[in-house]
Amino acid sequence: VRRVLLLLFGVALLVWVGATVVLARRERSGPLHAEFEIAGGVPATLYLPEPAVPGASGLPPPPPRGERPPAVVLAHGFASDHILLSGLARRLAQNGYAVLAIDLRGHGANRNPIPDGRGRPDWLFQDLSAAVEYLRGSPYVDGSRIALIGHSMGAFAALDFATRDSGLDGVVAISGAQTLVGPYRPANVLFLFASADPPGLQERATALAADLAGTDRVEDGKTYGDLAHGTAVRLEEVPGVNHLTIVFSTSTASRVLRWLDAVFRVDRASEAPPDLTDRRLAPFAVAMLGGLVLLAGVGWTCGGLSHGLEERPARGGAAGLLILAAGLLLAMAVLAVGVPAAFLSLEVGDVVVSLFAVAGGLLLCAGSLRARPIPVRELGLALGPGAAGAVGVYFLLTPLGVVGHRTAPTAERLLVAVGAAVLLLPFFLAFEAVLRRGGLVRATVLGVSGRILVVAALVGGVRLGVIPPVVMLMVPTLAVLFLLFEVFASGVYAASRNWLVIAVAESSWLAWLVAILMPLRAG
C-alpha cells in the first residue's frame, strides 16, 4: 500500500508541477499587460490589445493618437481583488479594448483601509476616480472613450460613480445594483445577473433597470433607450452560473463585449469571431486536480513527521456533533452583544473569527470540566508538523493566485493571520477532540459532518442577524474549501491518528484564508 501511495503522490506532483508551469507561461503570454500603482496607492494592471512579447519588460511606445483603443475600468467584488476579473480583462483585451483592473481599498494589495463611512454609496469613489483619471491621461488609450465594469460590490461602485461623472460612455453591472443618488443618469447601462444569484439581487437589478428605462418592467435581452444619446438600458440573465462563476463565464464575456461594441460603435462584421478563450483555465484545472491528490499526500507526510496517538474509541462521535452545535449556538449569543475579535480590523472576518474563537473557548472549558483537557505536551509536539502542513497547503493553492485571488499576504495581513490563527486554534482543537475518533472512514465521515454543521451555523448566523448577510455569497466557496481540507485531515489521520496536527494546520490555514480575503478596516 505504501508503494502505491508513493507512486500516486509522485504522479500527482508531476501533474501539479507541469500544469503550474504551463499556467505561469500562459499568464505571461496573451494580451500585453503591466502591473503598477496609480494615484492614491491603488494597485492596477493594464491590459492592452496587443500580444505580449516574451522576455520584454515594461510597455512599448504608445500608439499614435488616432489608433488608441477605448478603455474599460474593472472593479471587483467584496472579499476579492482584480485577479478574479483577470480572465474577463484578458478576453476584452484580446478583442480590442484596453482594460485597467484595480484593487479597491481594503482589498488585495491595496493598503488603504475601507473607511468608517462605507455605508455611503460613494465610499469607493476615490479609487474609481483614480482609475478613470489615469486612463484619461494615458497615452496608450483613447481617454475620451471610457466605460466601467463592476462585479457585485464593484457594480455598486461603478453605478454610483457613473452618477457623479458625466464623461463616461457606458456601465456594465454584473450581479450588483443599488439606488442611484448622484446628480447624473448613468450612461448606457447593461445589467447582468446569474441564474443562481440570490433572488433579492435579481429583483434589485430588474427594478433599477426598469426605473432607468422608464417602464414598469423590462424584458430579458431587450434594449431600451438610445445608445447614441447615452440612455440605453438592457437586462440579461446569464444561465448556468452563480454569483462567483459568472465572472469566468464565456457567455458573460460575450454579452459584455457585444454591449461595449454597441456603446463604442465597433463593427466586427468583417472580422473573425471574437476570441473569448482564457487559455489559463485548462492548466489551472489540471493543477487543482493534482493538488487535490497532493493534499492527502501532504497530510500523510505531516502525519508521518508527528508522533502517533492512540486511536480513540469510536463511540461518542455522533454526540460530538451535538456538543459542537451547542458551542456554536452559545457563541452566536455572544456575537449578538459584541464582536470580541474586532481588534483584527477585518470587515466580516472579525465576526467569523469571533464565532469560532468563542465557540472553541466554551468547548475547551467544557472539556476541562469533564476531565478531558487538551494534552499540552502533545500539542507542543504537533505545532511543527501542523505548521508544515499549513505551508504545504499554501503552496498547493498558489495557482489560485493566477486566476482567483492573490495568495501572498501583505505585511499587514500577515500580522492579522498570526493573530487569527491563535484565536482559531481552540475551536479546531475542540472540533477534532469531539469528532476525530474511530477508524479512518468513521473519522472522515464525522469530520465532513462537522464541517457541514459549521457551514450551516454560518448560514444560521446570517438568518439570526449576528453574521453579515454578505457571508451567504461566500458560503459555497467556503463549503468547498472546508471539504478540501478534510482530504488533508484524512491523510494525517491515516498516517498517525494525530488529530492535534490537523487542528494546528486547519487553524493556520483558515487564518491565512480570512486574512487574504477579508477587507482591512480602518483601526
Locations of the language-model features?
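N-terminal membrane topogenic signal
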Residues: V1-L8, A319
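Hydrophobic membrane-insertion alpha-helices, especially the h-region
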Residues: L5-A19
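Hydrophobic alpha-helical transmembrane segments in integral membrane proteins
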Residues: G18-L32, L517-G523
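Soluble extramembrane regions of membrane proteins in the secretory/endomembrane system
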Residues: R26-L276
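Hydrophobic alpha-helical transmembrane segments
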Residues: Y224-P239, W259-A272, G297-W300, G361-L369, ...
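Alpha-helical transmembrane segments of integral membrane proteins, especially early/N-terminal helices
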Residues: V247-S254, R315-G320, R377-A387
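Cytosolic-side membrane-insertion boundary helix
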Residues: D267-A318
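Alpha-helical transmembrane segments of integral membrane proteins
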Residues: L322-G523
